[in-house]
Amino acid sequence: MKAVFRSAAPYADDAMNLPVQDVDAAIPYYEKLFGFRVLSRQDAPHKSVILARDGIQIGLAENGGDPTQEGCFFEVDDVETAFAELKSNGLEKEEAGFRIDRHGDTSWKVFFVVAPDGLCYCLGERQI
């Protein structure tokens, strides 16, 4: 069973320009673990790739940014299914460490994943 990724929002600047040191080395992780597929590649003004899944897109770029200071929030339809999916795809994390975060009037059940490139991802399901 797979979760549906509903939206992507960057922590800082731009979910279409997330910094990585090596785009080509990063792609297999995003394909295998998250189920993204490559939509397009570009070499100028810097090497970058656009990845897509469930109608959402993110971009990875060799843009000189610090991956440890960036990341993205993915809204999913079912956070427990999302964790199980990532786990079955090779996520090396025994427990999700689910927690409830509140942003404004909305509560989210979330867990975090740090990619080998240093980018941090929060996957969350809106709580009613």
Predicted features along the sequence, with ranges:
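Short hydrophobic/aromatic beta-strand element in the GNAT-like acyltransferase core
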Residues: 17, 48-50, 57, 73, ...
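Amphipathic alpha-helical "stalk" segments
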Residues: 1-8, 46, 55, 101
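Vicinal oxygen chelate
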Residues: 22-23, 72-120
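Conserved catalytic-core motifs of GNAT/GCN5-like acyltransferases
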Residues: 17, 37-42, 100-101, 128
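Amphipathic alpha-helical segments
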Residues: 22-37
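N-terminal beta-strand motif that seeds the catalytic metal site of vicinal oxygen chelate
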Residues: 1-25, 70-72, 124-128
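Conserved short beta-strand elements that form part of the metal-binding/catalytic scaffold
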Residues: 37-70, 120-125
